[in-house]
Amino acid sequence: MSVPTAAKRITTRQLRMRTPDEPIVALTAYTAPIAGLLDAHCDLLLVGDSLGMVIYGMETTLPVTVDMMIQHGRAVMRGSQRACVAVDMPFGSYQEDERQAYRNAARIMAETGASCVKLEGGAEMASTVAFLVERGIPVMGHVGLKPQSVHGHGGFRTVGRGAEAEQVMADAQAIAAAGAFTVVIEGTLEPVARAITEALPVPTIGIGASPACGGQILVSDDVLGLFSDFTPRFVKRYAQLGPIIEQAAAAYASEVRARTFPAPEHCTGMPAPDGRPA
């Protein structure tokens, strides 16, 4: 009798070797049920620090903690079997120095079982990326618009104009040279993101960047139409689940108030209309 084997996860090495004719499909995931639904369709699931805004209603990602990332990372790992799972390193968990970054990254990897971590930053973070990679922790880079630096950016705005274009390019090249297996490019002018993609030896993953990127990522709640407070231009909604959820809640509330739910078929031992026990 054969015993079914669990699906093998996509590895960071496999993602690094992806060619332009096989784009990387990535979405964020924060919970086990959503991870389970997305798993078969995604190469990469990112447990993003965007959960602070999407799940917890925070105004920015800055208050997110390592403990929060670990709890959601565990949930996504339990809910998925196939996709490579990356966990964001939150603000303040890696910027101090390489050793702080290693302690927190190692803890995230050990306690979640995820395949890699993602951190924001450019050339100033290259030594940190190298430090982690040399110690066996795969790293995704993140350049362009960096949400953890939202105050320094002057808000959530597209980057890559004028001298910024050269800086974003230099940042991406430094992170790739340091050993990142892929680099996320966020909120960057399309020609700049395209040029970076063509210049790097590793795949890029775009979000509000360019169709030329080696892959694309979006926040799953945006894709599903669940998060309506703010919709960036680069978001495409593939479903509108928000109104469906509201309709279901309204129908439930109506039946409870009308005392039509629960009905006999939803109860145990309650006589049916014909008098027989249910």
UniProtKB/Swiss-Prot annotation:
What does the note under cofactor report? Binds 1 Mg(2+) ion per subunit.
Q: Where does Mg(2+) bind?
A: 49, 88, 120
Documented EC number(s): 2.1.2.11
Q: In which pathway does it act?
A: Cofactor biosynthesis; (R)-pantothenate biosynthesis; (R)-pantoate from 3-methyl-2-oxobutanoate: step 1/2
Superkingdom as given in the UniProt entry: Bacteria
Which Pfam family, just one, is annotated for this protein? Answer: Pantoate_transf
Its cofactor is:
Mg(2+)
In this chain, 3-methyl-2-oxobutanoate is annotated as bound at 49-50, 88, 118
Compartment(s) where it occurs, according to its Swiss-Prot or TrEMBL record: Cytoplasm
Keyword annotations of the record: Cytoplasm, Magnesium, Metal-binding, Pantothenate biosynthesis, Transferase
One cellular component term (GO) for this entry is: cytoplasm
GO MF annotation terms? 3-methyl-2-oxobutanoate hydroxymethyltransferase activity; magnesium ion binding
Catalytic residue list: 186 (proton acceptor)
Gene Ontology biological process terms in this record:
pantothenate biosynthetic process
Which reaction is this enzyme known to catalyze?
A: 3-methyl-2-oxobutanoate + (6R)-5,10-methylene-5,6,7,8-tetrahydrofolate + H2O = 2-dehydropantoate + (6S)-5,6,7,8-tetrahydrofolate
Complex and partners: Homodecamer; pentamer of dimers.
The similarity comment for this entry is: Belongs to the PanB family.
What this chain does, per the record?
A: Catalyzes the reversible reaction in which hydroxymethyl group from 5,10-methylenetetrahydrofolate is transferred onto alpha-ketoisovalerate to form ketopantoate.
> PANTHER family attached here?
3-METHYL-2-OXOBUTANOATE HYDROXYMETHYLTRANSFERASE
Q: Any idea what this protein is called? A: 3-methyl-2-oxobutanoate hydroxymethyltransferase
Give the species this sequence originates from: Bordetella pertussis (strain Tohama I / ATCC BAA-589 / NCTC 13251)
The organism's taxonomy opens as: Bacteria, Pseudomonadati, Pseudomonadota, Betaproteobacteria, Burkholderiales
